[in-house]
Amino acid sequence: PPSRFAQRMTAAVLVFACAFTMVHIGIGKFGQWYTDSDLVEQDTNALLLKNDLPEGDYRIDTYKIHDNIGMWLDKSCLQYFGSTAAPSILSFYPGLGVKRDVRSEPEIANYALRGLLSVEYLITTPEKRESFEDEADAGWTYLADVDGYALYHNDNYVPMGFTYDYYVTEATYQTSIKTLRSNLLMRALVFSDEDAAVYGKYLAELPTEKQSELTYDAYVQDCNDRRAQACSMFQMNNAGFHAEITLENANLVFFSVPYDDGFTAYVN
């Protein structure tokens, strides 16, 4: 009878669907049995490390460890997997030649991004130390192995909130090499023509010859210059941050934080 046939077909489809799902998920997880074998250990160690990191509010970076360790540490981290990010990051990162989809994963070779975004410490595992030191620039100092992690300090760290001496126009910025824009942004702010007309009195336009001197040594000097005019205090909470800076002359202060709809800044 037709009803008996329909029942048999339904049962067959359900059996096939269940079997296919089990096999498909099983095969998909095979590769993770090795790569995720130390996930719980790293997450547990991160909870210990949270209490042993140096005090203060700063960004961190990680190298070849599991995703979102920064969340366990309660620190803003360059390496992040998640869709809950400020919309502006979707234009900021690609503008620097850094891929940003559901994951933020700027390569360690982009050393200037670490200074620009005020990364003070980098965390990896002791097993990855040699690999990291082979890939990274010279601006990292190994501190110690702490709670199952290897801790490095960024010698070119610039505190959150710093000033500039120069600016470039958007037209100049758009003609620059994408992979060197992080270097350029350590030297100059980017102004639209309208911004230049209003704020150009505080900064000088970057000379042409300084627009191409974007070497590592020049970056180190730029970090020193930015650090010399940076905030003396920066404190974060769940509503935003409070910062203090003392300047000899009126100037603009750059903070590498989102400023999308819903964000407000107050200056006294």
Residues of each region from the PLM?
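Extracytoplasmic/lumenal acceptor-recognition loop(s) of multi-pass membrane glycoenzymes
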Residues: 16-36, 49-119, 157-159, 163-220
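Generic recognition of stable, solvent-exposed alpha-helical segments in well-folded globular domains
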Residues: 7-14, 44, 55, 68, ...
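Catalytic cores of large soluble enzymes that bind and process phosphate-bearing ligands
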Residues: 36-41, 247
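Active-site-proximal structural scaffolding
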Residues: 12, 39-46, 106-107, 115-116, ...
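Short alpha-helical segments and helix-capping/turn motifs at coil-helix boundaries
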Residues: 41-52, 105-110, 127-130, 137-138
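Signature aromatic-anchored transmembrane alpha helix within multi-pass, membrane-resident enzymes
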Residues: 2-22
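Flexible, solvent-exposed extracytoplasmic
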Residues: 113, 118, 124-268
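Transmembrane alpha-helical segments
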Residues: 1-2, 157
